[in-house]
Amino acid sequence: MIFFSDYPDIASNNFMDFSDHILSFYKQLDIHSGLPAGVEVLIPYQQDQAVSLCGQFYKKYYSDKNKRFLILGINPGRHGGGITGIPFTDPLKLEKYCGIPNTFAKKSELSADFIYSMIDAYGGPEKFYNQFYISAVSPLGFTKDGKNLNYYDVKELQEVLKNFIIDSLRKQLEFGIETTVCFCLGEGKNFKYLNRLNDELKIFNAIVSLPHPRFIMQYRRKQIQHFVDVYLEKFESAINSK
């Protein structure tokens, strides 16, 4: 079994590859500010199985020093990344597409269904993860009354999280992130917030929005192939203009 204690703290070793940086980042990931009443944080990186699965996944696909484009979702949900610790990767996709067995209940998450359809069309996990790194504006997820909560759903939560979001983003840039463009999942509030943050921090040359996978699966399911093509076209454009 792989433990986060096996990995050094961020930036402590110039010989760290992309996977080492990711796993060291997860090792220290926590929220120290007080959350609004009733809001609970999802921290899968404190669970032994999630820690082991993250180690297997990131060592399989990120054991190099290649630069990658960053894709930012909103925050993990309780049925996907909130369980496995891997963004948009539920236990079923982790086993079926990535070949990493696990004992979690094999439930599908809608967003993961779309993401892995797109990854499959791109050429498979190995090719996709060699060029892209998926995270979220808030790399930790939230629930309230047992339901998923977005960081922007509660104004007080968004305000409390700002320093955590900025600190997390800056740490992830050290992994080897390409800053010419960042892809944002969501064309509404997530895109607006990320643009405002980028105007303040001046990190990326451009933020490119993509329809959120959950929106596609809930409201445009019959057009999945169209949206897969939209993703692939925007990714190809970014790679070709690099």
Describe each PLM feature range.
Residues 3-4, 14-181, 191-196, 201, ...:
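A polyanion-binding, active-site-adjacent surface
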Residues 6-9:
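Intrinsic-disorder-associated, low-complexity terminal segments enriched in Asp/Asn/His/Tyr and depleted
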Residues 184-185:
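Short beta-strand scaffold positions
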Residues 188:
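Catalytic core of Fe(II)/2-oxoglutarate
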Residues 202-211:
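Short hydrophobic/aromatic-enriched beta-strand-loop microsegments
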Residues 212-223:
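Short, charged, surface-exposed secondary-structure boundary motifs
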Residues 241-242:
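Charge-dense polyanion-binding interfaces
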